[in-house]
């Protein structure tokens, strides 16, 4: 693309009349939305992949019903990712997951109408088929990258095949969460929600593939969950959904709640600020009441897993974690530090006010 950089007649906007060039800002929005969406999906998978590794190292006697000690149990804890729909977004997402997380090719499967067109991914070892039900039944995390018009039929195909513990991650923004929950008959669904700022700087570039764009430090900063740089704003309820999804993953393996809290602290709060050393009490640590009401915690037995959380409810209503994270700026800072570290960017404490900008959640859909 560098060879064409100075050839104005070959640029996208060359043939657009001057009076219509106002709409070119939509191109930047589209690209920003795709990059930010893929980055958040990659962070989500990185957290799940790391959690899977941590779970493999836990003693097998955590819960009486956990009785398998063989290699099959270890394999069962590996993260497997399925993608339904492999248009432009699906391909970019696949490449980001393979190169950034990274997800091993053998742990990634794609279902698309034209699997024969994905020759390059097949060469890498990714299984590409046209079998939505098979991919849905195999995956622990399932991404929906199809068109809104295709979604009802796809849901009909896969709803009876989905494991209760599978986390469905939907990029189909036109379908509200309650409707998606009904179509899939499934509660473990995460759907990021975005809105756009009116005034913004287009930081997203033009021609780079998303994995390459995510090597740019400015773009990495722009994708931070608490940052509105670049004009694409994530609904911070996504962070809550991620945390409760991780808890559900532990619950599916019958891990006691006390051990889950240790895992979450190790997974989400490994980075520390200088203030954590000078003032240890300011360093955030997760507690039971951060995720459940005090009345429920009082009646929770010590050697029990967390209850199963409906992720659609988590994203649509106020939760104990909503109140906790909004009242704890240091927790937001720690999550921002971790997010940047996942993408290979180390940021200083002085940069945090520009990275971890507190943004109010979007108006929830009904």
From Swiss-Prot:
Superkingdom of the organism of origin: Eukaryota
Assigned protein family: Belongs to the pyrroline-5-carboxylate reductase family.
Pfam families reported in the protein's UniProt record: F420_oxidored (PF03807)
Main function: Probable oxidoreductase.
E.C. number: 1.-.-.-
Keywords assigned: Oxidoreductase
Gene3D superfamilies: NAD(P)-binding Rossmann-like Domain
Primary enzyme class: oxidoreductase
Transmembrane segments: none
InterPro entries in UniProt: NAD(P)-bd_dom_sf, P5C_Rdtase_cat_N
Descriptive protein name: NADP-dependent oxidoreductase domain-containing protein 1
Taxonomic source organism: Mus musculus
GO molecular function, one term: oxidoreductase activity
GN (gene name): Noxred1
